[in-house]
C-alpha cells in the first residue's frame, strides 16, 4: 500500500465515531464521547505521521481508489499536511470541549455524530488529490454544518441563519461544479496535481479564465465575503463548539480552494484583481463593524468576516503562502477565542493596566505612524540584505505595510502625553516584534511551500493601483481609529456608531431583496 494513502485513516476514524454517535443519539450515550475524542486524537496522530511521510519521502500523490478519475486519492504536500495538522488539532480540541459542554443534552449523541462527520468531510477536502473527491467533500461539509447549525431546531434565528447559509452554499457548490467541468474540458483530467502543472506551463484561455472566475465565486460565497456575510454573524444560536469549528475551520474552505488551485488562479489576473478589491473592502468593512459590537460572540463573528476578507485580499495579490499562514494563525486564535468566550469579561476586567487610558493627539498619531514605518523599513532592509531582496515582492511589502498600521495604532497610545513610560516602551517593543515576525514568517512560509505554490508574479499597472488603494484605505482607517477618542463625544460619531453596529444595514437589505427569510412563529 502506498504510504501516501495514510492520511485517509484520519477521516475514516472520525466517520466510525460518527456512526457510533448516530446509533446512540440520546442523552449521555455510553462510550460515544470517549470514542469521538479518541478518534479525533487518532486523526491528529495520523496527521503527524503524514508529516513524517512528507519529510522522509517528499511530496507526492497516491493512486486513485476508484475508476475513470472518480474515487479517493490523496495529495500530500506542504499545503495538505499543514491543513491536516490544523484541522485535526482544532478538531480534537473542539470534540474534547464538546464532551463537557453538551453533557446532559437530550441529543448529545446526535450532535457528536454530525460534529465528527463535519470534521471527516473537511479532512477529505484538504487532502483531496482529485476534483471529484474535492467537490464531494465540499458538499458534505456544508451538509454536516447545516445539521449542526440546526441543533436547536426550535430557535427561529438559527433557522433563518441556516437557511441563508444553505442558499449561499448551494450557489457556491454550483459554481464549483461549473469550474470543475470547465477544468476537465480544458485539461482532460481530474487529478489536481496534473491540473496545476498544466496550468503553470500553459496560457490562460477563455475556458481557464472562466473556470478561475467560477472558483473565485465559490470561494467568495464559502468565505462569507461582502455582501453575503450576513449568515456568518447570525449563527450565534448554535452551540459554542459549532461556532469554534465554523469560524476556525469550515469558513477557511474558500481560501483553501484558491490556494489549492493557485497555479490556475495566477493565469487569470483579472479574477485576482476582483478578489483583491472585494477582499480588501470586506476586511475594512468587517473590522469597522466589529469595533462597535457590544457582545463578545458577535464581535468575534465580525472579526471573522474581516479576517476572511484579508485572506481573500492576500489571494487576490497572489500571496498564497501568506494566505495559508493567515489561515493557520486565524484558526488557532479564533478557536481559542470562541471556546474561551464565556470568561472574556472577567479576563478583561482582571488585566493590570500600567496607567490611565492614554488618548493620543494628532501629533502623537503622526509620530507613531512615521516611527512604525521607519521600524518596518529598517527591519525589511535587514531581512533583504540577509536573505536577498528578490524574495520580497512588492505585494508582500504592501501587505506588511498594512500590518504595521495596526501596530502604529498601539504605538500612538504609548506616545500620548498621559502614557506612562512602561506603556511607551512596551508598544515600541511590540512594533519591532511585529515587523520581525512578519518578515520571518513570510520567509518561512515561502520556503516551506516552494515548488508547491507559484511565486508571486511581478505586478502590472492594475496590481500597483490595487496595492496603493489598499495601503491608503487601511492607513486612513487606522488613523481614524487612533484619532476617534478625540471626537467620540460628537453627535455625528454617536450616529455613525449606531449605523456601523448594524452593519450599515447591508444584511437587512439583502434579506429584503432575496425575500422569504421570515420564520413563522411556532404554534
Labelled PLM ranges:
Residues 1-494, 498-523:
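...captures the hydrophobic TM-helix bundle architecture rather than a specific catalytic motif
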Amino acid at each position: 500500500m502506498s504510504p501516501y494513502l495514510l492520511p485517509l485513516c484520519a477521516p475514516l476514524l472520525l466517520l466510525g465515531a460518527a456512526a457510533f454517535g448516530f446509533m446512540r443519539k440520546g442523552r449521555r450515550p455510553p462510550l460515544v464521547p470517549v470514542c469521538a475524542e479518541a478518534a479525533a486524537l487518532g486523526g491528529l496522530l495520523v496527521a503527524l505521521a503524514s508529516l513524517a511521510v512528507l519529510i522522509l519521502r517528499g511530496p507526492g500523490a497516491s493512486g486513485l481508489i476508484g475508476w475513470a478519475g472518480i474515487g479517493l486519492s490523496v495529495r500530500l504536500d506542504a499545503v495538505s499536511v499543514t491543513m491536516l495538522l490544523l484541522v485535526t488539532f482544532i478538531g480534537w480540541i473542539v470534540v474534547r470541549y464538546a464532551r463537557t459542554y453538551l453533557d446532559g443534552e437530550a441529543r448529545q449523541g446526535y450532535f457528536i455524530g454530525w460534529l465528527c462527520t463535519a470534521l471527516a468531510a473537511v479532512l477529505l477536502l484538504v487532502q483531496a488529490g482529485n476534483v471529484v473527491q474535492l467537490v464531494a467533500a465540499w458538499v458534505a461539509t456544508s451538509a454536516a454544518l447545516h445539521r449542526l447549525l440546526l441543533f436547536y431546531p426550535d430557535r427561529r434565528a438559527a433557522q433563518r441563519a441556516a437557511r441563508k447559509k444553505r442558499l449561499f452554499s448551494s450557489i457556491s457548490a454550483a459554481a464549483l461544479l461549473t469550474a470543475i467541468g470547465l477544468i476537465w474540458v480544458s485539461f482532460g483530467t481530474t487529478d489536481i496535481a496534473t491540473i496545476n502543472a498544466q496550468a503553470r506551463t500553459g496560457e490562460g484561455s477563455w475556458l481557464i479564465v472562466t473556470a478561475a472566475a467560477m472558483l473565485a465565486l465559490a470561494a467568495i460565497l464559502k468565505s462569507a465575503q461582502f455582501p453575503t456575510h450576513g449568515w456568518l454573524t447570525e449563527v450565534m444560536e448554535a452551540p459554542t463548539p459549532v461556532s469554534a469549528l465554523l469560524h476556525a475551520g469550515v469558513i477557511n474552505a474558500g481560501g483553501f480552494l484558491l490556494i489549492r488551485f493557485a497555479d490556475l488562479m495566477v493565469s487569470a489576473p483579472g479574477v485576482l484583481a476582483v478578489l483583491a478589491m472585494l477582499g480588501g473592502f470586506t476586511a475594512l468593512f468587517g473590522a469597522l463593524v466589529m469595533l462597535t459590537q457590544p457582545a463578545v460572540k458577535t464581535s468575534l463573528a465580525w472579526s471573522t468576516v474581516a479576517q476572511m476578507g484579508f485572506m481573500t485580499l492576500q489571494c487576490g495579490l497572489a500571496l498564497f503562502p501568506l494566505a495559508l499562514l493567515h489561515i493557520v494563525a486565524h484558526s488557532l486564535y479564533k478557536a481559542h477565542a470562541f471556546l474561551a468566550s464565556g470568561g472574556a469579561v472577567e479576563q478583561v476586567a482582571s488585566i493590570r493596566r500600567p496607567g490611565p487610558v492614554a488618548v493620543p493627539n494628532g501629533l502623537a498619531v503622526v509620530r507613531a505612524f512615521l516611527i512604525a514605518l521607519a521600524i518596518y523599513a529598517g527591519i525589511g532592509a535587514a531581512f533583504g540584505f540577509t536573505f536577498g531582496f528578490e524574495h520580497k515582492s512588492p505585494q508582500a511589502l504592501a501587505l506588511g505595510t498594512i500590518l504595521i498600521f495596526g501596530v502604529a495604532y498601539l504605538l500612538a497610545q504609548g506616545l500620548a502625553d498621559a502614557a506612562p513610560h512602561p506603556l511607551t516602551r512596551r508598544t515600541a517593543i511590540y512594533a519591532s516584534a511585529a515587523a520581525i515576525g512578519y518578515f520571518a514568517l513570510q520567509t518561512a512560509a515561502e520556503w516551506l511551500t516552494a515548488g508547491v505554490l507559484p511565486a508571486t508574479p511581478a505586478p502590472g499597472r492594475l496590481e500597483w493601483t490595487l496595492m496603493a488603494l489598499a495601503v491608503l484605505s487601511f492607513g486612513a482607517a487606522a488613523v481614524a481609529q487612533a484619532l476617534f477618542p478625540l471626537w467620540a463625544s460628537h453627535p455625528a460619531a454617536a450616529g455613525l456608531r449606531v449605523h456601523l453596529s448594524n452593519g450599515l444595514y447591508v444584511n437587512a437589505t439583502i434579506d429584503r431583496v432575496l425575500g422569504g427569510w421570515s420564520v413563522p412563529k411556532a404554534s
